[in-house]
Amino acid sequence: MSYRQLGFIFFLILPFFVSAQTSTQLSASEIKLGLKKLNTLGSALYIAAHPDDENTRLLAFLAKDKNFRTGYLSLTRGDGGQNLIGNEQSELLGLIRTQELLAARRMDGAEQFFSRAVDFGFSKTSDETFRIWDKEQILADAVWVIRKFKPDLIITRFPEDSRAGHGQHAASAIIAREAFIAAANPKRFPEQLKYVQTWQAKRIVWNTYNFGSLNTTSESQMKLDVGKFNPLLGKSYGEIAAESRTNHKSQGFGSAKQRGQAFEYFIHTEGDEAKTDIFEGINTKWNRLVEGEKIENMLKEAELNFTVDNPAMSVPALVNIYKALSSLPDTYWKAQKMLELKEIIAAAAGLWFESYTLQPIQTLGDSIHLRSEIVLQSSVPVKLIRVNKQILNIELKEGIAKTILSSIQANEISEPYWLVNNHPQGMFDIKDQLLVGYPEKRSTALIDFIISIGGQEISYQRPAEYKFTDQVRGEIYQPLIVAPAITASIADKAYVFPGNTPKTIQVLLKSFRDKSSGTLIPKIP
């Protein structure tokens, strides 16, 4: 069976192995936190080797206290790890651990990235690791993520030497340092520059650790208290970190919540050396953008006047900020803040919209019948201009849900993009450069909602999902799955042929349509 078939078949049952999602809407305190984040133009990227290597406490602090755009680049998907919740190994385990990382990021507020490296199991040294990994290709992937994400600060979990305790750990630190340098060099991986620009991060540091038997921390190192309490969330970052880390269920990483002071320690690796604070010299103000100061002042005023009892009162000011931001020259930070701002506007206005199907599996080439629902939960005047190609021009009324029926074509099979092609031991084979780094391929079943609010048209996209109500768990959302019309698999994993004696092989066919017919022609090797 090919990796592509393996990935697709498991994709059908993956929802049973990961935590089902429920859709949520931002609370007033989360909207206020979002306003603070809007006024912070800083970013940090954490780099390590595997799922569960990341420091969730530091990620939560960076994302929710410093309000940085925060990411974690795991070079592998953890294919070579243990599995305490099932029998899945190798690529199937990598699928599970990918979902565990995404669940963890939903808790701590960071974003998730991967390279094409395969976790092939334990290795003693980085040299041994690079005999199996294609170092140059993985370096290119890390450079690609850095050039797209544009971090001001890069942080590694491990050192480059034997203290890392694992060859892949040490290799991740080497890749991170070399990528920090190469990302700024236009002569390195120039083929990427038709999509992205070079990027020079301010510095790269090593986040040292005390793992009990191995303590690499010292009071002479830069340190940062990440154990603070966030009153807007009602939690400390130690509590958020435990909730995040507990999602690594296949590794048995259920974690106790920690409260109170907690220090992280850092050693300078490359770039502008900081003396006492890893954030030294990083400009997080709007003056990074031409005419950005006016946006900063408008956001400060919006935050000052924000009322938790009635977030909708802030909508006119937020729409004015959106208009002002739209007029600025196109930059990375303009695009990022436009995305953040329009979600804050929708949340403050009490706008809820979604698109879903009642069928768990769709068939390639068929029409997917969707229900799109939108409801306004405030008195803010909002007009629904269109949903996809349906022109509506409807004035939404407070508390009255509007349902729109539509259909889209199921034009692409749901499958993990990194398993489409067969691959060697150490590397996934990914043909499309634009997919590199993503945890999953973005859904092609995206529904456009165009609204008019405060005289400004704003476009939103929501993925079409499968929604159902479970008698025990309640309302559940799962990814919409598109399957081929028919799949075929061999009943047994292996057959023994003694001599030239023929054997009967059972082939299992499954149709994802009500009625299917055809002829099965086996290709004998």
Question: For each predicted feature, which ranges?
Answer:
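Beta-strand-rich binding/interaction modules
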Residues: 367-394, 402-407, 415-418, 445-450, ...
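Bacterial N-terminal signal peptides
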Residues: 7-17
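Active-site rim/loop-helix segments in enzyme catalytic domains that contact anionic ligands
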Residues: 21-148, 170, 177-181
